[in-house]
Amino acid sequence: ENLSLIYNIPIIPGKTLLFFDEIQACITAISSLRYFYEQYPELHLVAAGSLLEFALEELPSFGVGRVRSLFVYPFSFEEFLIANKETMLWGAIQKATPQKALLEPIHKKALLLLKKFLILGGMPEVIASYVQGKSMLDCLRIMDDLIISYKDDFSKYKKRVPESRITEVFDSVMQNAGKPFVYAGAANANYKQIKEALDLLIKAGLVI
């Protein structure tokens, strides 16, 4: 009722879709989801956000059985090729075997695209920018902006793990990509503190 009054839009159960975006910024809104299910089940409600695992760490309990979760992941190499209209190449890669390898020119093309994918990563905005013909530099700027926004969000969820610890471990993982992760050099902290920060980053899908 209050939302209807604020936005001057009627909310009609069964017809209106209520969308809570960036819900990770409001712990109270996350807590309210279970009550919508229990007290207002006829209303269609969708919530979206990033680093939700960080926010959920702040809650004593979450609406188990009352909230259905859907996870969105970065692009896979297959999806990257499809976005670049290289479905034929992906089909050829799938059919290739050690006995029936790709022809050298096709193999070189696949490796070039793989290298670009490894540089760009799989974030949708970055891939969309690349597909639209933007330069690699433009794509890297978007990646920098995404990293900054993630780090800004770290500060909102620091009850369990200090923000500085999460940032240190996050930076260490990025700087040592492709190398074995060594706890001793990850941050100025003990094993337990580093593991807590790393576990949180893994749960958030920022580290795999």
Predicted regions and their residues:
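Short glycine-rich substrate-engagement loop in P-loop NTPases that contacts/grips substrate
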Residues: 1-14
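Short regulatory helix/loop adjacent to the ATP-binding pocket of P-loop NTPases
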Residues: 35, 53-69, 81-86
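Interdomain hinge/linker elements that couple catalytic modules in large macromolecular machines
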Residues: 87-208
